[in-house]
């Protein structure tokens, strides 16, 4: 399955909450149906991107990066690359690359959508990132570090997040914590939630860029 086909299938089968999330799902689907190149970074003025919100196993801390160009705290994420085979794979690759963490337990189902304008992405002008967000767990205390795209990577308590964090980031964090809480079963790992059907991927599992 191509990356474009995977993105269409994931969004077609995803059940968003009513309101803005449902509207964004339709917006993203219309874009992909109209543009076979809709995931390419050269698709102007809109293209689909993917990201991941990383939480500690007890869900009380979130790992964020201080973006070098935007100078704001974000979840991890970015553009699709030629070697990517799925949207969840894009999110996982970006999460591993930008966090410096060796492995993440990824929920393969989208958790949140967001559309945002970016002024520094394309020399032709402002582009809109149609961002499909996933969520993952990483062990608290695991080694991490900033990539060339970030100024800092840091764990933040969910009740003491960076000042000025955007409303959509608060929505993403809340939605991700709710998703993991709902996934807890009697067969979950001791000490924290685990997805039924989720998977832990190491950096070595990812295609080269």
What residue ranges belong to the model's regions?
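NUDIX/MutT-family hydrolases
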Residues: 133, 144-175
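Intrinsically disordered, low-complexity terminal tails and inter-domain linkers enriched
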Residues: 182-208
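N-terminal strand-loop-strand
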Residues: 39-75
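Active-site segment of metal-dependent pyrophosphate-handling enzymes
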Residues: 100-142
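Acidic, metal-coordinating catalytic segment for phosphate/diphosphate chemistry
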Residues: 13-51
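Conserved Nudix-box catalytic region and its N-terminal flanking loop in Nudix hydrolases
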Residues: 60-101, 159
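Short, well-ordered beta-strand micro-motif
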Residues: 54, 135-137, 157
């Amino acid at each position: 399955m191509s990356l474009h086909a995977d993105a269409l299938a994931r969004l077609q089968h995803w059940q968003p909450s009513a309101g803005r999330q449902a509207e964004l799902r339709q917006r993203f689907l219309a874009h992909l149906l109209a543009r076979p190149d809709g995931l390419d970074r050269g698709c102007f003025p809109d293209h689909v991107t993917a990201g991941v919100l990383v939480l500690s196993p007890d869900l009380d801390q979130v790992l964020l990066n201080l973006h070098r160009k935007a100078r704001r705290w974000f979840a991890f994420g970015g553009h699709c690359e030629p070697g990517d085979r799925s949207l969840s794979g894009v999110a996982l690759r970006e999460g591993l690359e930008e966090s410096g963490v060796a492995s993440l337990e990824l929920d393969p189902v989208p958790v949140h959508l967001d559309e945002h304008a970016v002024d520094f992405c394309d020399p032709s002008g402002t582009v809109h990132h149609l961002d499909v967000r996933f969520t993952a767990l990483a062990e608290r205390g695991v080694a991490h570090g900033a990539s060339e795209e970030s100024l800092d990577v840091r764990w933040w308590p969910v009740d003491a997040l960076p000042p000025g964090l955007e409303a959509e980031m608060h929505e993403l964090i809340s939605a991700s914590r709710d998703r993991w809480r709902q996934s807890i079963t009697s067969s979950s790992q001791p000490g924290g939630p685990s997805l039924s059907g989720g998977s832990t991927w190491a950096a070595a599992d990812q295609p080269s860029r």
